[in-house]
Amino acid sequence: MLTLTPVLTVSYEAKISFLFLSVVEFAVGIMANAFIVLVNFWDMVKKQPLNNCDIALLCLSITRLFLQGLLLLDAIQLACFQQMKDPLSHNYQAILTLWMSANQVSLWLAACLSLLYCAKIVRFSHTFPLHLASWVSRRFLQMLLVALLFSGVCTALCLWDFFSRSHTVVTSMLHMNNTEFNLQIEKLNFFYSFVFCNVGSVPPSLVFLISSGVLVISLGNHMRTMKSQTRGSRDPSLEAHVRAIIFLVSFLCFYVVSFCAALISIPLLVLWHNKGGVMVCIGMMAACPSGHAAILISGNAKLKKVIVTILFWFQSRQKVRRVHKVLPRIL
């Protein structure tokens, strides 16, 4: 059986370093995701129509902003208030439950976006996939609303189960004097809440994996077609395939890392009481939304154009300042 040495507390320097890293990850994630939100929101203010991909990215970035805030609260709660020798505080469990719910919403949005990529990029030869792809393109906004509604229902059920179960556990603990038995009940309650909240992630995970697999197969078929034909140096279809797969694979990697870190943090919290290990897990969870937002920006033509414009404006301002500093010396 795997045993770890309990680390009930960590040094003051480790706490400061952990909080500093958490604030840096929070700042990077907020700037990256807020940039995506502001660019698309500004287009809406200028009454420029947003395409389906922009709308999905806007919703995904708003969810990521909420995730980053929850993870910062999680880090502060762990470093400053949660003692490993004590039972998990209700606030800490509530923050983790909200994080799992928000993470599930982001998974639904990514699944919808992967379906949109399939509908726009993959060239189907059979009738049913063609009709399905056409339906996804025409009804994407309705599909997105249904996904958000379903994830909202799952979130409401998860929160209702968590708070009602927590109330039941607190009531039973007040009527029982067996401290060890009460702790075991609370651990089982938190583990059950974790499992229950992630049951709703199964359907979007299947949709995401199937659509990603279809894109990979389509890319392989396209590469074989290119080998048998003489094509120019630039292939828009190949570029679209590669950009979509980079987005999907990066999201999958970040999601798996984040989910595994959250899963590992549970036994570290309730069984092994290893505070240092939990800090590492939370740091990994916080790095995922900001890292994926950076990949989204680097692969989106509109967002890259805005960044280039901002950099050009900043360089122009710097040149103007230098000129104003040099002119008084000349005169």
UniProtKB/Swiss-Prot annotation:
Cellular-component GO terms for this entry: membrane; plasma membrane
Which residue stretches are annotated as topological domain Extracellular? 1-17, 76-94, 164-198, 265-276
Carbohydrate-modified residues are 177
Localization in the cell: Membrane
Annotated membrane topology: Multi-pass membrane protein
> What family does the entry list?
Belongs to the G-protein coupled receptor T2R family.
Annotated protein name in UniProt: Taste receptor type 2 member 38
Question: Where does this protein come from, organism-wise?
Answer: Rattus norvegicus (Rat)
Q: Which gene encodes it?
A: Tas2r38
